[in-house]
Amino acid sequence: LKGNTMIPDKLKDDFNSLRNMFDELKREIDKNVVREENYKGEFYEISPYSYQRNRFKQGKIVGNVTSLKTTNNLFTYYFDVKNQIIEIREGLELKNQFYYTFFIYEKELMKTIAYDNSKRIVNVRYYLYGSNGKIEKMYSKGSRGSREETYFYENDRLQKIVIRQFDRNDIEQDTLQHSFDYKSNGELKSIILSTELYSETIYQET
């Protein structure tokens, strides 16, 4: 039965209040940057298997950024004194155009705010941690709709993520599931995307 979104009101308020806050937010975040790292492609998992779930392999480190012919797919990670990622800059096909994601850490919560290359807000996300220190819920509010992800673990290992999707009027649309299979040594083997109608392998370790 499709229902209404369970997206927290606070998240909706944040999405609206942060809509035009790019410059101010970037100024505040940048004050806390102590180092940066550059990669071609995504390198760090923001949530469990975040880039694998989007069908990508892990990015490669870039030693000398000035030697690159293009900034397309260049990911720059900015860290604070606690070695936490507080900003990600993602290069686009257009020369020297970037998407930005900012990170704010609170008790049992990680908040991300994403903007496009025109400083328009893309989404705000809440990642909620459980007593095991692992992400249990992710709520996202974006310009095109919202989503709720629930993470299920067994023996401290992620087994599946159930993804509920809602349109911009908060009416529930599709429910997806990502299921995770592991090698005998505990490394990720594959990810299967399934709906009520079909399933497909979206990531396969070779």
What positions do the PLM features span?
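Buried hydrophobic residues that stabilize the cores of well-folded domains
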Residues: 4-206
